[in-house]
């Protein structure tokens, strides 16, 4: 048993960050930008690469406005055309791939057509796998210039192995998301200790980590940064917007949009190996407003951390308060 697992387990609602002396007059002085790969983005936030969160139209808007994105892989036949379309618009292309045999043919097709995406994400529920490692090696051999993220994982050992195989970043989180029921269906995952898993993985990581899942409040973004995340992947909080995929549904005068997990019945089209669920999320208006609010709250986090940029958050102290911070507020 690795001694990392002797650490106390905790999650986002169990932690409060401790303020430092402020050095800015206004939070507007605080810089939230982050370099990821060869590009710098406005905030360390990326919408989940789920079919109910992102589509081509939203990907274009995000790239045009300085945000990172990862296109989902659930319409595989459209990916090459998507890369071509983004490049023709002068935008970066960021795609997802799996590990099935035909994905190797897809990589070969991209090389043959000279359609190399700037970012590629190997998107597998259990990313600590010999097949993921094989795919990492293949992609880095065929497309050495693509910035390659691999995941998802839960342990320091997994981070080490994927990095050693050639991954440029690793995605941490197995089943903590709102629409994911892996923890209930299988008994495995980081649900309830996602933040502790991130902390453990950051102890050994030599390359960037993406915290994926379990984000419920904007303050959780700052907590993710404190415990080692370079980027924070968010699903349910970035679903339900005007630009989001999914049908608009009205119930008792209230407006909702559909949101579903990537291994749900909706996604799979049949009841088989289901580890996700469908739900309704409140309609939230424009995603631009939500992303701006996330930026402003993160600026406030930086000011509380006593700094001017995200690095200051990584140095603050924290206390474990075990589910008392909500104090009936939510």
From Swiss-Prot:
List, from the UniProt record, the residues annotated as the active site of this protein: 180
Ordered alphabetically, the record's keywords are:
NADP, Oxidoreductase
A GO cellular component annotation in the UniProt record = cytosol
Q: What is its EC number?
A: 1.7.1.7
Annotated Pfam families: IMPDH
The UniProt record lists the keyword NADP: yes
Q: Which GO BP terms, alphabetically? A: purine nucleotide metabolic process
Residue sites binding NADP(+) per the record: 209-232
Q: What SMART domains does this protein map onto?
A: IMPDH
Under the heading InterPro entries, the entry gives: Aldolase_TIM (IPR013785), GMP_reductase (IPR050139), GuaC_type_2 (IPR005994), IMP_DH/GMP_Rdtase_CS (IPR015875), IMP_DH_GMPRt (IPR001093)
Q: Which top class of enzyme applies to this chain?
A: oxidoreductase
Signal peptide: which range, if any?
none
List the SUPFAM superfamilies hit by this protein, alphabetically: Inosine monophosphate dehydrogenase (IMPDH)
Give the Gene Ontology MF terms in alphabetical order. GMP reductase activity
Known catalytic reactions: IMP + NH4(+) + NADP(+) = GMP + NADPH + 2 H(+)
Biological role stated in the UniProt entry:
Catalyzes the irreversible NADPH-dependent deamination of GMP to IMP. It functions in the conversion of nucleobase, nucleoside and nucleotide derivatives of G to A nucleotides, and in maintaining the intracellular balance of A and G nucleotides.
Describe the family membership recorded for this protein in Swiss-Prot or TrEMBL.
Answer: Belongs to the IMPDH/GMPR family. GuaC type 2 subfamily.
Protein name as annotated? GMP reductase
Organism (species): Lactobacillus delbrueckii subsp. bulgaricus (strain ATCC 11842 / DSM 20081 / BCRC 10696 / JCM 1002 / NBRC 13953 / NCIMB 11778 / NCTC 12712 / WDCM 00102 / Lb 14)
């Amino acid at each position: 048993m690795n001694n990392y697992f002797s650490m106390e387990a905790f999650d986002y609602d169990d932690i409060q960050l401790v303020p430092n002396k402020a050095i800015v007059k206004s939070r507007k002085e605080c810089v939230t930008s982050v370099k990821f790969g060869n590009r710098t983005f406005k905030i360390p936030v990326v919408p989940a690469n789920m079919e109910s969160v992102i589509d081509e139209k939203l990907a274009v808007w995000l790239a045009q406005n300085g945000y990172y994105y990862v296109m989902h892989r659930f319409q595989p036949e459209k990916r090459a055309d998507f890369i071509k379309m983004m490049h023709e618009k002068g935008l970066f292309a960021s795609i997802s791939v799996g590990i099935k045999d035909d994905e190797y043919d897809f990589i070969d097709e991209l090389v043959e057509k000279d359609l190399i995406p700037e970012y590629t994400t190997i998107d597998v529920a259990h990313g600590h796998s010999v097949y993921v490692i094989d795919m990492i090696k293949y992609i880095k051999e065929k497309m050495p210039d693509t910035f390659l993220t691999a995941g998802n994982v839960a342990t320091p050992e997994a981070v080490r192995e994927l990095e050693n195989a050639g991954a440029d970043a690793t995605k941490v989180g197995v089943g903590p998301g709102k629409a994911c029921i892996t923890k209930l269906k299988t008994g495995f995952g980081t649900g309830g200790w996602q933040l502790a898993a991130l902390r453990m993985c950051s102890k050994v990581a030599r390359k960037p980590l993406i915290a994926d899942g379990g984000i419920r409040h904007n303050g959780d973004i700052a907590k993710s940064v404190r415990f080692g995340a370079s980027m924070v992947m968010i699903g349910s909080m970035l679903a339900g917007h005007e630009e989001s995929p999914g049908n608009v549904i009205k119930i008792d005068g209230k407006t909702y949009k559909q949101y579903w997990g990537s291994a749900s019945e909706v996604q799979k089209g049949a009841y088989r190996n289901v580890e996700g669920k469908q739900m309704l999320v409140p309609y939230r208006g424009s995603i631009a407003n939500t992303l701006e609010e996330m930026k402003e709250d993160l600026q406030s986090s930086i000011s509380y951390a006593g700094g001017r940029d995200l690095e200051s958050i990584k140095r603050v102290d924290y206390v474990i308060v075990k589910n008392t911070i909500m104090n009936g507020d939510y």
